[in-house]
Swiss-Prot record:
Swiss-Prot/TrEMBL cofactor(s): Zn(2+)
Residue span, SprT-like domain: 13-156
HAMAP family: SprT
Protein name: Protein SprT
Localization: Cytoplasm
NCBIfam families per the UniProt record, alphabetical: PRK04860.1 (NF003421)
Bound cofactor: record note: Binds 1 zinc ion.
Alphabetical UniProt keywords: Cytoplasm, Metal-binding, Zinc
GO biological process entries: response to stress
Active-site positions on this chain: E70
A Pfam family: SprT-like
PROSITE patterns for the chain: ZINC_PROTEASE
Protein family membership: Belongs to the SprT family.
Amino acid sequence: MPEQLKQRVETCYQQAEAFFKRRFPRPEVSFKLRGQKAGVAHLHENLLRFNLQLYRENQEDFLRQTVAHEVAHLVAHQLFGDRIQAHGEEWQLIMRGVYELPPNRCHNYDVQRRAVTRYIYRCPCPQSDFPFTAQRHKLVHQGRRYLCKRCREVLVYSGETRVE
């Protein structure tokens, strides 16, 4: 499946080379991107990173729009240098002129949020649940103390967790 994506990167570069009548160095392509971003262009490393999960779930649009979007960042950087805005007129020129695509800044793919465990802390106040992140819960275990803003008592772990 990533072979189609790599082929689309190559096609985008060939289009840019035909349009600008010059060669561009090919980037390294990585699929080590997670979370909400569909793709990232690392300008100084000449590296493209893509979110394989979002690619699998939105293959057609991803190949057409997202790959061209990220390649356009590298091409714009190689043509115009560091002093351009990420989604500025130079990048937009490449999206419209070279790839004949709308210069959309963001994707609208459904992104699965990961489940997060919250650790419930309490104080003597009524209805005083304080959901702590795993990081804050760990800090409490290391000796950090948190106080209730109302009663100024130390918050105590209730032994309960909640998945959000």
